[in-house]
Amino acid sequence: VAGLRLGPLLRYADPSSATVWVEASRPCTAEVRCADGAGGTARTFQVAGHHYALVPVSGLTPGTTTAYEVLLDGRSVWPPPGSRFPPSVVRTPAEDGGDAVKVAFGSCRWAAPPADTEDTVGPDALDSLAARLAADPGAERPDALVLLGDQVYADEVSDAVEQRIRARRGLADAPGAEVADFEEYTWLYYESWLDPEVRWLLSTVPSCMIFDDHDVIDDWNTSAAWLADMRATPWWRERLLSGLMSYWVHQHLGNLSPAELAADPLYAAVRATPDATDVLRAFACRADADPASVRWSYRRDFGRVRLLMVDTRAARVLDEGRRAMLDPGEAAWLREQALQDRGSYDHLLIGTSLPWLLPHLVHDVEAWNAALCRGERGARWARFGERLRRAADLEHWAAFPASFAALTELIAEAGSGADAPATVLVLSGDVHHAYVAEPRWPGGSGSGSDGGPDARVLQLTCSPVHNSIPLSIRVGFRFGWSAVARALGRRFAGHGGCARPPVTWRRTGGPWFGNQLMTLALHGRSARLKLEQARGKGTLAVVEESDLTSR
């Protein structure tokens, strides 16, 4: 008899359709059956001995909320008997796209420990959100949960996962107490997504995901020298291929709409073979050999809100002479999606796990380091720069100066002119604190008050959902925004011969430290921001609330 091993995850919802992801214990037919008669079925596909399905749900009524159940080979497996949570539901937007849209986002989540053990990093923001929604099912809830990277930590496993690794293969050989292959990756997803609160939350709130480094390894693709060192190890290839395969199965597949899934040749090939392990492994090999041949970035439209989720890890160009955050094809895709039919959206959200605008000292140090690494101060400084880059995680947009300038230019273009949206908002995580920063253009197109774009442009950074915030991070990032730090940063930039960035910016909110989520409420051309921190089981405290469209 087929059982439900993981899920369900409600991944996509539009006015008339949805997708629901599950893992079953054996091959079977998965069915989603809605209370209003809508539904769908899908046969499981197999990867490395595991059985998955992404069920397309059709026939939904726009602007409604309907409960659903999951059946495997005709037997109901969700909701579980005696569940303490309300029924899982699919909530569809109205056909005209005129509804208010709420988008919650954050990044960096260690799996919460079992309920009977102490949580050393404090309450989990997703657990707290789930508890609040479960306590009042009629309360306002996000229309989408945007998870901006580090959904799992392949290089920082829990004690429980480490014990399983020790029992399976020992810890003597590299990568030791880190994930080695696809099977061990599945343990991370079980640990994270079987958390009862998170499991229910992901079953009833649609989610969008993108990887960051820890989904594979810390500093993933930080430089060409780093990659060469990793490829020289005996364990890296299996780790990377397994990371990409498990990401495709658990996260990427659900990012796609039913129409995109129907046109996806890899998805068709995976479903057409009794065991898709080799098919998916060949895909991961191609992604490793030629990253430009694969696109992990994607677009989601929520009525008149456009979300572009950008891959800032696998799409990099690492050659020091032409270093870029995005390869040419990826950059062209981002530009096309941002500028296409601009009059059809009121808000443009750019999801990039790595922040565009950083504290000024951090930005200048990253630009200086990039100059050293490309040899601007000679070979000795280049070697020092590479060591520093890895030790200090100097790999955000500022560490790719040409890409920083190109993104800045694209944001200005997308936000200017008669068809400009009300806002262009860059959503990021990674840095284990939250802040709001606003750029200021020295001139250029648009009729904005500062000579920049007509749209309100902001960097919104929110991290972590559930992770540690060492004192050094708190002190360092507070200092990084100060006038003294800005002056110090200019000294570094001068030493590297760095050009001034094309915009200046100032911090307008934060820094805030804690396990937290930001939520955008977007309606017509108005936008409001709320930052909430987890303060206890089921408690999210509002620490900031502001109107983003009034200047």
Where would I find each of the regions flagged by the language model?
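Metal-dependent phosphoester/phosphodiester hydrolase catalytic core
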Residues: 1-551
